[in-house]
Amino acid sequence: MDFSNFLCIEQELKLIALLVILFLYDTFCSKEWKKYFQNIAIVGFAIVIISEFPPYFTMYGEAFGGIHISSQLTFFMKSILNVATFLVFLQANKWLSSEKMLLRQGEFYVIMLISLLGMYFMISAENFVMLYIGMETASLPLACLVAFDKYQEKSAEAAVKYILTSALSSGVMLFGLSFLYGSLGSFYYSDIALNIVSSPLVKLGFVFFFGGLGFKLSLVPFHLWTADVYEGAPTSVTAYLSVVSKGAATFALIFVLYKVFGRIELIWNNILCWLLLATIVLGNLFAIRQQNIKRFFAFSSISQAGYILLGIIAGTAQGMTSTIFYTLVYLFSNLAAFGVIASVEYQTNGDTRIVSFNGLYRSNPGLAFVMMLAVFSLGGIPPFAGFFSKFFIFMAAAEQKQYILVFIALLNTVMSLYYYLLIVKAMFIEKRGEVVLEKIGIDNYNRISMVICTIGIFVIGFLSAIYEYIETISFGVLQK
């Protein structure tokens, strides 16, 4: 076997090496040494991330018979997922340090890294079989993570819902892939892109395939699992689902639509337009009436997926660039919010109702400030990064004369400000009554994560070099 194949999977090999080390440490170390596991996992993953820059030994190109591809773009996408996962690790520290979780830390980190490895394969796939294997490798560990807090009934219930809907989406995707293979005779992206025709079988195959991937993105009508799973899962797992899992699905969808189905753009463009409208509108409408903060962010996440579709619908290099940039900004904004949620939830013994945030500013002004920045960025209020990411998305769609979609998206952006400001109102204006929320002790790891997210929210929008870099490395992906 050619050794250059392994140079093309440098990121995967480093992650596998860390996985093996953590697994062996957790398996063979004594209980006295288990207390150091978190530090080893966090520092080890940080070393893996840092060691990838600059990528001296990474070789770009196809590997293992063309089923895997590495490029500057895939490297950057995986790096985005790495940063998001690292921030989730930091935020999970206090929860995993509790007495009931102390001996289960190893399981949490190993399972989450296995899921991340599957997402690597989804991004680098050049073959639909590879994409499916990556998706399943990512999904099965996620079901374990959703049920990780076995002492909570909602966690087990959420896991069952996630497993059932995930299995259904996998079956639907395989059904679609069977149509594509039957009509085109190949699973390779390049072969399908070369021979694809607008036949009824291809159209049907695409619809079923997209339905399976739409589950990962929580697009309407594939979103029914989202609110219950987000509410029932441990908060750190919810953060991972809303950012890392959604990001991997977004990146995989970009490659499939632009590289494989670029020649039948008119077909998938029409489908995505209707899904976009339903996703943005229903996500916003249901978010308004939520009383639980995690369900609130579940529907917020659904509506945010609609903006991602708007960038993809543009079908241009600018549209793809703005979609990737939007995902990067969404990472910092959403994880900043979940860092605050995790802290408040721990202090209030698992209370995730929005009213539990009443008067947060009076006792914990720092946390209230971070949450305010997060929801302002998610709502697209200038001068935060979320404003610039939405602006680029709207510009990309407007350049392709998608004026109606842009107008509806703008209206829904204004609508979203109402429910985002409800959180700000609860923290800064509402009073808690007789029960006063004590000052929350934030551990150093979570504090670091929120500082990183805050810097990202403030700075990324003004760094045009990041957008330009994404535009540069995205060159050549479009196949029409």
UniProtKB/Swiss-Prot annotation:
UniProt function note: NDH-1 shuttles electrons from NADH, via FMN and iron-sulfur (Fe-S) centers, to quinones in the respiratory chain. The immediate electron acceptor for the enzyme in this species is believed to be a menaquinone. Couples the redox reaction to proton translocation (for every two electrons transferred, four hydrogen ions are translocated across the cytoplasmic membrane), and thus conserves the redox energy in a proton gradient.
Subunit structure: NDH-1 is composed of 14 different subunits. Subunits NuoA, H, J, K, L, M, N constitute the membrane sector of the complex.
Family under the similarity heading: Belongs to the complex I subunit 2 family.
Biological process, per Gene Ontology: ATP synthesis coupled electron transport
Organism encoding this protein: Azobacteroides pseudotrichonymphae genomovar. CFP2
Catalytic activity from the UniProt record: a quinone + NADH + 5 H(+)(in) = a quinol + NAD(+) + 4 H(+)(out)
Gene Ontology CC, one term: plasma membrane
Enzyme Commission designation: 7.1.1.-
Keywords: Cell inner membrane, Cell membrane, Membrane, NAD, Quinone, Translocase, Transmembrane, Transmembrane helix, Transport
Major localization class: membrane
Stored Pfam families: Proton_antipo_M
GO molecular function: NADH dehydrogenase (ubiquinone) activity; NADH:ubiquinone reductase (non-electrogenic) activity; quinone binding
HAMAP family: NDH1_NuoN_1
Entry superkingdom: Bacteria
Residues spanning the membrane: 5-25, 40-60, 69-89, 110-130, 162-182, 204-224, 237-257, 266-286, 296-316, 324-344, 368-388, 404-424, 450-470
Protein name (database record): NADH-quinone oxidoreductase subunit N
Membrane topology label: Multi-pass membrane protein
Compartments, record wording: Cell inner membrane
